Structure formats: structure tokens, C-alpha cells
Amino acid sequence: MGFCIPSRSKMLKRGSRKSSSILARRPTPKKMNIVTDLENRLKKNSYIENTNQGNILMDSIFVSTMPVETLFGSYITDDYELKDLLNVTYNIKPDIVPDIKLDAVLDRDGNFRPADCFLVKLKHRDGFTKGALYLGHSAGFTATICLKNEGVSGLYIPGASVIRSNICQGDTVSRSSRGVQFLPQIGGEAIFLIVSLCPTKKLVETGFVIPEISSNDNAKIAARILSEKRKDTIAHIDTLIQHRQQLELAYYNSCMLTEFLHYCNSYAGTIKESLLKETIQKDINITHTNITTLLNETAKVIKLVKSLVDKEDTDIVNNFITKEIKTVEVLKQRQNS
């Protein structure tokens, strides 16, 4: 959607106001201190810069943390629409959130208001390797809020200088409408609330200038490299889970064959068919060889995963693998019962 902006002047190019490294990790969020209404208002973002040339839409990144407990509720229902396209997989649905619950992402000057809200769900393997999700007003801001993250999530704002390699619950990234690229999700499930902030009638009547969008080629390359790295990590994790399942099946077969052979030996006087015993022993030897091979392959994959996953995320990945294996075991038990 678009509209006419009075007093549009020469396009200005502005860089990010907050400096940060290309690849950034945010530490575990600390508890928020209680502040007065005035302090809270002063700490809010300001999306418009007043200059001699008029009001200018800022091309800055605003990264912060906010409590999200009040935003829980609608994301629990599983009525998302799956978007499975080339290089893009995610689940999305529109959402309605009262403005009062979104106060943390509003600007201090009251120049923007919440318009549309969307919930985006990412499961293991979901995400973007190319492109981005564009929602909201072309002359506004888009706030991306992490409501839940059980795995390793990351996002990149196209053209920006910051890549968040691991998003935590409560993390908020606000940026002039450039879209958002969710990096491939490693393990678990993540849910984000995307809030479109549109200019208010007051700002439209006053008029403001949309500057030329800045670009950062280094960040774009870094985001592409990180996406490919995550794809490799996901593939190795899936292989590791498969090896674990095959190992458990091989151990089970080995135990059953050994028990059967023991039974045959116990009743040697009754079971005189030596060929049967030889066949069982041969199967046991083959199973043991398979186990050894799987153990060696598993060790190699574990080494690869360790080299690709950040140390801070090791426990998350381990927990996900264990949970996936248990889930498969439960499903098999239900099928056999």
C-alpha cells in the first residue's frame, strides 16, 4: 500500500545509527528493571529524524529485549499456512494484538502505529536460503519479536550490517521496511511475531522523506555463507539421527540373534540342525560388522556437527537429537501395539 508524502526532497543516504559487528550473538537476556513512565518513554525508539531538510525516515537498526508473556496465546493454535517454495519454507498466519501490548516497539514521538501483525513459525529445516519475507508498509517500520525458540534461530535484515546468529525469546529487531530473512532453523521450533508499523495521520500530514536505502555487501555475503553453513549442519544432524536409529535397530537384532543362538545351544539334543546355528552366527557377525561401521560413521558425523555448531548451542542440538530419537521410538511402539 502507498500514499503521497508531502514535501519530498532530495533523497538522502543514511547509514545505521547503531554500530555493531556483522555477525552478532546476544547473551542470555537479563531481567528488565522497573522504570518510570518518563524513563520508559525516553528509552523508546525514534523512527523519524528532524533535520533542516525536514523529517527523515531513519534507516537504522533498533535491537532490544522486551517481555513477551502478554503476547502468548494465539500462537499456540496450529492454524498456520505452510509456505514451501524454492529456497523458502515457513508457516505463517495473521494475528490480532492489542496496541497496548506492543508499546515496547512504538516510537516515542507517536509517529507510527501498529497496523498488521503476523505470526511466523519455523521448524527444524525451515527458513530462507535466499530472498526475504516482506510484510508491512513500504514507508514504515517492521518489528520482529521472538516469542519462542527451542532451537537455534537467526535472522538477517537485507542490506543491513547486522546478522543475529542466535535469537533468544524476547529479542526484538526493528528496521525500516526492508523485509526479514530467517536463517535456516536448527532443531526445535521458533515462533516470531512480525508487527507492521505504519505512519500516523499526523506524520503523513507533516510530511517526511524516505532516504535511499543503504546497502552492505559484506553482510549479504556473510548471511549467504551462514545460511549454507546451517544447511550443512542440518543435513549432518539429520544423518546423525538416522545413524542413531539404525544403531538401535542393529543392537536389537544382535541381542535377538544372540538369544536365539543361546536357545539353540541349550537344546542341542533336540535341535541337531547345525546349518541353522551357522546361519544365525553368520547373521550375528554381519550385524556386529554393521554396528562397528555405524559407530565409525556416527563418530565422524559428530565431529562434523561439533565443528559447525557454536559451543553455546551444543546443548540445544544434543537435546533436539535426543528428543527426535525418543519421538521416533514412541511412534514405532504405537504402530506395533
From Swiss-Prot:
The keyword Ribosomal protein appears for this protein: no
Record has DNA-binding as a keyword: no
TM stretches of this protein: none
Stated induction or repression of this protein's expression: Expressed in the late phase of the viral replicative cycle.
Stored InterPro entries: Poxvirus_F11
Keywords, sorted A to Z: Late protein
UniProt family annotation: Belongs to the orthopoxvirus OPG055 family.
Function description: Stimulates increases in peripheral microtubule dynamics and may increase the motility of the infected cells, contributing to cell-to-cell spread of the virus. Seems to inhibit the signaling via the GTPase RHOA and DIAPH1/mDia.
Protein name: Protein OPG055
Source organism per UniProt: Vaccinia virus (strain L-IVP)
